[in-house]
Amino acid sequence: MVEELVKKKIIPIVIGGSQDLTYAMYRAYDNLDQMVNLVAVDNQFDFAKENAFPSNSYLSKIIIEEPTNLFNYANLGYQTYYNSQEEIDLIEKMYFEAYRLGEVATNIAVAEPVFRDADLVSIDVTAVQSSFSGNFMQFNPNGFNGKEICSLTRYAGISDKVTSFGVFNFNVTSQEAVLIAQMVWYFIEGFSFRSNEYPFGSKEKYIKYIVPIDDEELVFYKSHISGRWWIEIPFLTNVNNKLKRVTLLPCTNEDYLAACEQEIPERWWKAQRRNIL
């Protein structure tokens, strides 16, 4: 069903059930001839653990089982004490992205370019503080507040690239229902403000900036319409590229300014490494 909706450019919003439904949503892209970027708002990475529930172990299946269409996994809001050091190291080893709760809560805008590059967004409601979600059956003293989680869903909605969206792992209570309804409302509001920029727009609508760093040339693009930024991931010769053409990676003005100071943006470096793994 998700596959058919995505083919028809209809965005499915999946509400309810456990978060391992993310795996089924991911598999819906198998026949769409594309690599998939998954963004999860979650307090843990959901790798398979001994005696773990399926809802807390779906990511291992996505990474291991074929066909392997996953290009990037990005986690927003993980809390260190819920994740082993081995899991954190594995995220780094695979050049995935992970942003701690405090990092995102302090500067919510750090999530915008992450969502702008997402195809599939999966939100675990247990990433929200219980005092805001109303979930006291599985008490979470820390997490995003109501304003922050709605800001994140709005970023997901406004992303031109997001084609499926899910909200999972909540208890069917009237308290949580109010928050989830508002999260979905903000996603839909964000969708109404989509600007149809990259990958749909023409490069003529962008200003191109070339920044030399050592033996590299970083190519940035800034949109005339929204003022948003992208950085080019080049197609490398003589290696196997997962991305079969030159691609633009969403970034920020701060990434451009850092490049001008000879600092290579971390998201660009990780994307380069993933592309040739």
Model-derived segments and spans:
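Conserved alpha-helical scaffold segments that buttress catalytic/binding sites
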Residues: 1-167, 171-277
